[in-house]
């Protein structure tokens, strides 16, 4: 478009029409920042719908792998990457290419600090790198989970300060503006029962035009979009979803501890309760929460609530219950060893499964890492096995530096501790070959043996 031949009054409308046309004709360029467990699947989904997609990441290893047609995520085969490359998908670490995009979607990590406060470093650094390269009429969408207000209070000021542009507010029809929305990711790794396209996409725009742009863009790859009034409402929606899960998991974890004292099988109780066709949704106990959302998100809201002189007692209590579960696991293991006249100090323990949930290659916030650290600190000789991880290196909290052990000679271990119930494990054989099993996931359901301690 030649700006010399377009009046100031009509330029924004022309930009809006151009964006809509480029989306509808699949000529829009889409940039996705963060080629991880959220960003890469999203980029591939856009590519499958024949958008021209560029993936951005600061990790050169990811860029090299993608450029070579490879995949570093278990559930994404290399053939999907190769097919995307055939449709024009590219990967880069150079933010100078941001200006070529019609829409830029930010999918970067938002962990907690050691003091359980929001760590928005990745969002801030991304925004600072993005700002000098954005252009008028672009749509910028944040997908990273954070507290209500992050989009407007953190992202937008950095983008405005680092560029000569302003985020469109109000009617949004003015020169020199870009458009901003928040749309929370809803990835559920390892869940193949719901197609990604069938997961409704929640959208909150900074103004009506931004919301419309985002709805049109996401509506081209998702079967349903759900618009809410503001980015903060969309941010709160994501937190509600995950806090709902966190609180209910904490409830069933606490009930499990009570059931153990009462000599009741909590797993049997849950299976019976879920036969009720209304008013009950089954949640299951475990060794603790893991992943990039459920253990983290409640504390984002709790932190923000304090700015409003509000204490989220219920949420924080649920977080404390879930955070205590690795300690319960270790205590149960110690008791099981003591019953066999053994001590944890010097015991050989094999941790079976270290991913945060079954059948995924993701270690983030996994309770297994805390359990391993606790066992080591009490003198246990700890090994692990997980089909997805040949090595555990330095993480955000722990530097375990362990290589995967073999499943041969399980009888050499004083205890096999089941933390993650991967589907590929032959649990009957594992029980048969082991001296003692401590099962935190009910993975040995249906197997009767005095070797098994369920906790």
Predicted regions: what is each one?
Residues 2-455:
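Structural/interface elements that position substrates and couple domains in central-metabolism enzymes
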């Amino acid at each position: 478009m030649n700006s010399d031949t377009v009046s100031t009054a009509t330029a924004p409308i022309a930009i809006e029409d151009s964006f809509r046309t480029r989306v509808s004709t699949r000529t829009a360029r889409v940039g996705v920042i963060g080629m991880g467990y959220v960003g890469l699947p999203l980029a591939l989904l856009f590519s499958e719908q024949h958008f021209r997609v560029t993936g951005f990441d600061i990790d050169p290893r990811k860029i090299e792998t993608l450029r070579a047609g490879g995949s570093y995520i278990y559930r994404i085969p290399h053939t999907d990457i190769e097919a995307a490359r055939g449709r024009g998908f590219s990967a880069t670490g150079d933010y100078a290419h941001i200006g070529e995009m019609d829409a830029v979607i930010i999918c970067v990590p938002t962990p907690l600090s050691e003091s359980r406060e929001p760590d928005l470093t990745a969002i801030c650094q991304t925004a600072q790198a993005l700002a000098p390269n954005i252009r008028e009429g672009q749509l910028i969408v944040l997908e990273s989970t954070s507290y209500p207000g992050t989009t407007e209070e953190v992202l937008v000021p950095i983008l405005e300060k680092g560029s000569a542009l302003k985020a469109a507010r109000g009617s949004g029809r003015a020169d020199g503006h870009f458009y901003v929305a928040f749309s929370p990711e809803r990835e559920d790794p390892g869940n193949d029962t719901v197609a990604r396209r069938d997961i409704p996409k929640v959208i909150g725009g900074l103004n009506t035009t931004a919301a419309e742009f985002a709805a049109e863009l996401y509506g081209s790859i998702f079967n349903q979009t759900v618009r809410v009034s503001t980015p903060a409402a969309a941010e709160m929606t994501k937190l509600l979803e995950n806090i709902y899960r966190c609180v209910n998991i904490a409830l069933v974890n606490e009930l499990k501890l009570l059931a153990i004292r009462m000599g009741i099988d909590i797993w049997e109780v849950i299976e019976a309760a879920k036969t009720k066709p209304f008013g009950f949704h089954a949640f299951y106990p475990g060794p603790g929460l893991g992943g990039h959302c459920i253990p983290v998100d409640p504390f984002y809201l709790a932190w923000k609530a304090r700015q409003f002189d509000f204490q989220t007692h219920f949420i924080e209590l649920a977080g404390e219950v879930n955070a205590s579960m690795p300690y319960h696991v270790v205590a149960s293991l110690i008791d099981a060893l003591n019953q066999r006249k053994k001590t944890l100090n010097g015991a050989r323990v094999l941790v079976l499964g270290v991913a945060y949930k079954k059948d995924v290659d993701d270690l983030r916030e996994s309770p297994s890492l805390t359990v391993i650290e606790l066992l080591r600190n009490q003198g246990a000789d700890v090994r692990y096995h997980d089909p997805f991880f040949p090595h555990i290196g330095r993480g955000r909290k722990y530097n375990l530096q362990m290589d995967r052990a073999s499943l041969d000679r399980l009888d050499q271990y004083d205890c096999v501790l089941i933390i993650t119930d991967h589907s590929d494990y032959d649990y009957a054989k594992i029980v048969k070959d082991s001296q003692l099993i401590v099962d935190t996931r009910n993975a040995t359901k249906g197997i009767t043996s005095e070797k098994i301690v369920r906790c």
